[in-house]
Amino acid sequence: MTLPLSTPTDLSRRSTLASQQEAPAMQDPTTSRPIVSFQDVTKSYGSFTVLDHLNLDVAPGEKVAIIGPSGSGKSTLLRVLMTLEGIDQGQIRVEDDSLTHMPNRNGVLVPANDRHIRRVRSKIGMVFQSFNLFPHMTALQNVIEAPVQVLGMNPKEARERAADLLELVGLGNKLDHYPSQLSGGQQQRVAIARALAMRPKVMLFDEVTSALDPELCGEVLNVIRKLGAEHNLTMLMVTHQMGFAREFADRVCFFYKGQIHEQGTPAQIFENPQQERTCAFLSAVKEAN
C-alpha cells in the first residue's frame, strides 16, 4: 500500500500527536512486546475523521479502560481491531502478526487476505452493547455454536467447556434457558461466556452495561472483575462506568476527536488530569451522576 508523502506541517502535527499518545511506563520493561499495537491508524467516514493517526500499545494481561465523549472514536477502535471496520491508513498488530498486512512471496508487505485476517482475529473476543444471542437456542447452545462450527471442536468437549464457562459467569443453573427467559444482565453474561468459548487472548468490551439498569449492570461488572482476577486476559473496555474504570483498569485512555488526548493510571486521570478537555469531561460525568 502506497501512503501519501508527509508535508512538514503533517510531520509536526504527528509529532504532537505522538507526544500526547505516548504510553506511560506501566508495565515491567522486561516484559515481551505488546500483544496489541495500533500504529498510525486513521479511519474516516467521508469527511469525518474518527481515528486520527492513532498510536497505542497494550501489554499482555493489561486492562485498559477507554473513556471519552460520544463520537470520539472509542467504539471504532474496538471495531477496527475486530475487523468489523477497515482502516484507511496505518497498521494493527496482534502479537507478532499484522491484522492489516501480510508478507507476499518476496517478503513485501501487502494487504492481508481473508484467511490471514481470520487467523489473527481468532485471538480476539468481543462483547457488544447488544447481546445478539440466538433466540431459538438455549444459553448452552449459544455458547457451543461457534466453537463447533468455527473451531471444529468436538461437540462433547464444546458442551463441557460451555457448561464450565456458564458456571464461571454465574449461570450454571440456566444452561437450558432461552434468551427470552433470562434477564438482560443474564443475557450479557451468556454473551461473555460465548466470547470466552473461542479461547481469546484479548477481550474487548464495548459499553456492555449501557442497556442495563444499575442492579443488572453490577452483575456484569462483577463477572468482568472475576475474569480480571482469575484469568490472564488482556482487556480493552469502552465504558461510561467511571467508578469501575478507576477500580479495575491498569490504564485509562481519554479519547477526544479520534486521538488519545490523555492517558495514565486511574489515579492520574481521575485525581490529577492534565488536559482541560479531560477535566471538563470528568466534571460533566460527575454532575450527571
Whereabouts are the PLM-identified features?
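ABC-family P-loop ATPase nucleotide-binding domain
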Residues: M1-T42, N289
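C-terminal boundary and immediately downstream tail of ABC-type ATPase nucleotide-binding domains
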Residues: T2-L3, Y256, Q263, A267-N289
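ABC family nucleotide-binding domain
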Residues: R33-P266
